From Swiss-Prot:
Gene3D superfamilies: Zinc finger, CCHC-type. GO terms for molecular function: nucleic acid binding; zinc ion binding. Residues 168-222 are annotated as: Disordered. Keywords: Capsid protein, Coiled coil, Host cell membrane, Host membrane, Lipoprotein, Membrane, Metal-binding, Myristate, Viral nucleoprotein, Virion, Zinc, Zinc-finger. A zinc finger (CCHC-type) spans 501-518. This is Gag polyprotein. InterPro entries: Znf_CCHC, Znf_CCHC_sf. A lipid is attached at residue 2 (N-myristoyl glycine). It comes from the Viruses.
Amino acid sequence: MGNSSSTPPPSALKNSDLFKTMLRTQYSGSVKTRRINQDIKKQYPLWPDQGTCATKHWEQAVLIPLDSVSEETAKVLNFLRVKIQARKGETARQMTAHTIKKLIVGTIDKNKQQTEILQKTDESDEEMDTTNTMLFIARNKRERIAQQQQADLAAQQQVLLLQREQQREQREKDIKKRDEKKKKLLPDTTQKVEQTDIGEASSSDASAQKPISTDNNPDLKVDGVLTRSQHTTVPSNITIKKDGTSVQYQHPIRNYPTGEGNLTAQVRNPFRPLELQQLRKDCPALPEGIPQLAEWLTQTMAIYNCDEADVEQLARVIFPTPVRQIAGVINGHAAANTAAKIQNYVTACRQHYPAVCDWGTIQAFTYKPPQTAHEYVKHAEIIFKNNSGLEWQHATVPFINMVVQGLPPKVTRSLMSGNPDWSTKTIPQIIPLMQHYLNLQSRQDAKIKQTPLVLQLAMPAQTMNGNKGYVGSYPTNEPYYSFQQQQRPAPRAPPGNVPSNTCFFCKQPGHWKADCPNKTRNLRNMGNMGRGGRMGGPPYRSQPYPAFIQPPQNHQNQYNGRMDRSQLQASAQEWLPGTYPA
């Protein structure tokens, strides 16, 4: 920078020596000019990539605010500012000395001097205009790029909204198909409704419409969750099951370029305020959503590729202060990993909020084959703890009642009848009993499936305890069998093994013969017929049977009460068949 032929003043040499001494002290004799050039170029876009010695660029560079650059760049700019001021002062002194010399010798050309001054002024004005024009062009270019990025982001958000709407319609169609399938099934306990996963029916559509984030969308929202995708290298995919469907997310790998070839370094990228606000809305409501809190936190940590510091940052937004204080008291919470911190916060929520009772969920819990007794009890324990609101050390009896009632009906009846003291047993004692009766039921079902149909009809019905059940008789080949069957006092049961919940009287499922409403209605209509069966009889043995009375004439059947005079006159008139009395 400046004229190398002129000798710099002592002040400039002193500043130069001080700056060189500072560089040797701070940087051990080496200065990272590449990093300084990059730092200046961010604030001054017209700065060349390899640096420059042009005065016009340095005069603009020293105007950069020092608080917007790094420390070493600020030191360099301070030094250059001093150098430029010293150079301007030296130039002014040289011009003054030259003018005085011209005045002494009397060879000053005033017109030539004025022409040179005007020429220098025009050159400086032209240089300033060029700089302002380039700054204006660069600013307009940045504004156009920002507008284009906003337009692209809005278009991609519209596409994602359309994809989510299509997925929601597909889920509604799958639920409707499942309900129609349930309605077509007969009301029989031997049939089991196959619970179909909604995600399997729409796996092809989900794979074609999976929400994937891109690097051009830092605020991309995927199924209610914001993703971060700045400065990513190779994306990593993760599949999360949400609302019965499999959703594939794309989270960034936190590897940032170091500027030295292809080498990268992991840098922590904390949550942004917009992401924290959206995650607070998506978090399950407390305390009702405590059972789903652990799963939601685990999915969020996997989607955002979070570490322990991110968990603490998210906890300050979604959890109140008492919950965070309780979690901090837990031993080892400060140095715990991500999974341990999530479990600590769930435990703190259970301790802070009152227990939520949902006995409907507990009563609806049932055994699902092919579970073992241990797996069934383990799953039941989770459901009971999340919905009972009782302390575990005082909930043994209701828990055992829950697991026994949730077994298949035949297994439940066999366990209760074979073990009258089942309600007083402990959990380790009841698990082997349940496994024993489940094995008996499975062997009996397998034996029935392997036996041919003809042998099943010929075999007597067997219960799980070995007692013979009722088997209906077969229709005979006697002549006029249908006429003889009409004269039987009570209908016979159908052949074969009748399901245990079918009535032998009305042949309708849902109750037994002793509780049949049709049987009670028929007996109520018969009235006090006595001991004589359907034809009636005396209520006691000492009373004789009443004489049968012949029915009256047809036109008098309607008169069952007291007959007045008009009715007597009408009945006394003579009339012929086919006519009616006047």
